[in-house]
Structures are given as C-alpha cells and as structure tokens.
A protein has these predicted regions:
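Hydrophobic residues embedded in beta-strands of well-ordered beta-sheets
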Residues: 224-225, 258-260, 321-322
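Intrinsically disordered, low-structural-confidence terminal and linker regions
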Residues: 1-36
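C-terminal active-site "lid" helix and adjoining low-complexity regulatory extension at the edge
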Residues: 6, 10, 14, 273-292, ...
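Short, surface-exposed beta-strand-loop junctions and turns on beta-sheet-rich folds
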Residues: 163, 234, 330-332
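A long amphipathic alpha-helix within ATP-dependent nucleotide-binding catalytic cores
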Residues: 197, 201-207, 229, 233-317
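Conserved N-proximal alpha/beta basic substrate-recognition cap immediately N-terminal to
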Residues: 24-149, 297
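Protein kinase-like catalytic core scaffold
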Residues: 155, 226-228, 323
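Active-site nucleotide/adenylate-binding loops and adjacent lid/helix of ATP-dependent enzymes
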Residues: 103-223
Length: 379
C-alpha cells in the first residue's frame, strides 16, 4: 500500500510529459543552458585575456580560445590544472572540465538534493546519524546560550551558504575579549556554529591547525553505489581550513587501498611529497579507518535514493568515529581527481555513470534540442 502514492505520482508525471506545457518547460530550460554557456564564454575569455596580457608563462590566447570553444575550460584549468597548453587534442579530450560537469549536474541533480546540500543546517538535519558534533545557529540562541556554547568547546563559525572555506573562522573562549560584539557579529550574519572536533592523530599531525578532511566522490542511485575518487585535503600556513583556496594542499587517495601513492598538489601546481609546513610524509600515507569511511558514505547515500553525485567531506576522529562534516551535490572533478596526475577521467565517468544511472552522461554536455529529455533537473 505504501508504494501506491508513488505509483500514482509516476503515472501522472508520465501523462504530464506528453503535454505541450512540458515541452515548453524543457525548451525554457534549454534556453537557460544556452544563456549560461554564453555568459561563461564571456567571463572566461575576459579573464584569460587579462592573464595573457600580463604575460602568461605558457600557451597563447589563441590556443586558449580554441580550448574554451571545444572543452569549456577556465584559464586556471588551461594553465595549471590540466596544463592544456602542452597537450594535443586527443589528450585534452580525456579531461572533463568544471563547466562540463556543472552542465551535467544542472540536468540530472534534483531540486530536493540541491536544496538539502546547499543549506548547511538542512544537510546536518538530514544526515544527523552521521554527525556527532554539537551545532546551533547563532541567531537561534541568546547571548548567554552563545557564550555557554563557546566556553564548552572551541567553535567553528560558518556562513550558511558559504563555499571554498570563505567566511569561516575559529572561536576560542580564551581569546574572546568582547562577548557582546562577537555574539552580535555571528547573530547578524546568521552564522552556523559547530563544535570543533579533533581528527585522529595520524591525520592531525599532517597540519594540526586544520581538521584535514577526506573528500570522497561517489555515484549512487537506489542501492547502486561506487566510490569514483577520493582525496585528502590538508591545511597549510596555520590556516584553520583545508581548502585549496585558502592555501591548502590535496593528495589523491587510491580508493582500493586507502593509500596516497603520489605527491600532493596546491592550487598553483606545486607538488609535495611531504607536507610543506610539518614535513610529515604524504606519499605512502595510509588513511586510517578507510573501510569505515567508505561504508559511511554508502550509508549516507542511501538517505537520498536519487542523490546521484556527491562529494562527502569526512574525518576519522580521535575516538575512532567517522564524522561527516559537509556534503556537495556537485563535486569538482578538476581538483584531486584529475589535476595531480594530469590524467583525465572522462571515459571513466562515462563508464561508471552508465553502470549506476543507465545513461551516457557525456551526452548531457551537448547543447542541442535533442537533449531536451535530459533537462528535467532544471525544472
């Protein structure tokens, strides 16, 4: 009996798909995608023109424009991420750019998934079984409650809709001089307050100031699940966050073994066999509790059967528990999955997504009216 409402909705949706209104909605979505492509082209071209005008170290503006036309790459991807300037066309085609991945995400990631993952509190509530730390909203507590929360443990303050580590800072009670102004700042900015957790010792020693999270990229639908790739993100320079945008470094993890077999890399394509600050070896490092981390991702993916893509940020804690920190419904493929080894994953993505989703996701990149049926995620 429980499946009857779902069956009824599916039947009604099938009827709706035969109507002229549905076709018009798909046409609107296609026009939106076309607009996005043109805007990307303008922005990327302007950035590249400025960089080449300053004296770019490699390649040429003409070659970049050709790469942009064919593969929708940014200047960063062309110059540093994938080093397109040194590749022939066959080698370039092995990579999938961030813009191409975003095109896929727009078309097949559902609105429910987007809304859940974009809002940090909605995510924490939906995936509560995998979150062990305390948290609260600054604008949802009094001054006294705010102070008691901070005095109980160090706190990380985050914007609700922040990305790339922007706007994140750490609060230590011993360093607070004006509680009222700090509370007002957090409350007025609607910041999320989270208890600071400690990673297990092997992870922590890499860079003690930051948590050093593990990003696991998964593909899933229903009971189907696979780990597509993973990387260890480490802070640097004493930063409390481990994002590359804040100067952090990252290293790809072998999904089969949980080991790091190759050097880490930063946003400027510098490679590190040892951490640049602590000198702790990175190559040969084995992620503690790797099997439990993968199993946590598998269980979390089942919470939303139509999740499809996810980038899970996790960390094994000092007590052995696996802590889910954040999630991303549109994980980057341009970082740890392709850049460190300069090896493209386009064909691997086609094969893995075909097994999980039953479609050729590379077809979703093509901007033709023939792909109208793939624009449902934008409605």
């Amino acid at each position: 009996m429980a499946t009857q409402p779902v069956q009824n909705r599916n039947a009604l949706y099938h009827i709706f798909k035969q109507t002229a209104l549905y076709e018009k909605m798909l046409r609107w979505a296609w026009l939106q995608e076309t607009r996005i492509r043109e805007e990307e082209k303008r922005i990327f071209t302007r950035e590249a023109r400025e960089q080449f005008g300053k004296g770019a170290p490699h390649g040429s503006f003409a070659d970049y424009k050709d790469a942009l036309r064919r593969h929708r790459v940014t200047y960063q991807e062309y110059m540093y991420g994938y080093e397109y300037w040194k590749l022939d066309e066959a080698a370039r085609d092995a990579f999938i750019s961030r813009s191409e991945m975003q095109c896929i995400y727009r078309k097949i990631v559902t609105r429910e998934v987007r809304q859940t993952f974009r809002n940090k509190t909605a995510f924490l509530e939906r995936f509560a079984p995998f979150v062990h730390r305390e948290w609260r909203m600054a604008d949802g507590c009094s001054m006294e409650e705010f102070r008691a929360f901070v005095e109980a443990h160090d706190v990380i303050a985050k914007p609700l809709d922040g990305t790339c580590g922007e706007g994140i800072f750490k609060i230590c009670a011993s360093e607070v001089q004006d509680w009222e102004s700090l509370y007002a700042r957090c409350r007025d900015r609607h910041l999320l307050l989270e208890e600071c957790v400690r990673a297990c010792e092997p992870i922590e020693q890499l860079h003690p100031a930051s948590l050093n999270t593990i990003r696991v990229v998964t593909l899933s639908q229903g009971d189907k699940f696979t780990v597509f790739g993973a990387l260890l993100r480490m802070g640097a320079g004493g930063s409390v966050i481990d994002n590359t945008h804040a100067g952090g470094v990252f290293a790809p993890i072998n999904p089969e073994t949980g080991c790091i077999d190759t050097p880490a890399i930063d946003a400027h394509n510098h490679h590190y066999e040892r951490h640049p600050d602590t000198d702790v070896p990175i190559v040969g490092f084995t992620i503690p509790y790797w099997e439990q981390i993968v199993e946590t991702c598998r269980k979390a993916a089942r919470v939303m059967p139509d999740l499809r893509f996810a980038g899970w940020d996790l960390c094994p804690l000092a007590d052995g528990r696996i802590e889910l920190i954040e999630g991303n419904h549109a994980p980057d493929f341009d970082g740890g999955l392709q850049a460190p080894l300069k090896v493209g994953v386009k064909q691997k993505l086609k094969e893995s997504a075909g097994e999980i989703f039953g479609i050729n996701v590379l077809e979703l990149i093509k901007p033709t009216s023939k792909t109208y049926n793939h624009y449902e995620g934008m409605l």
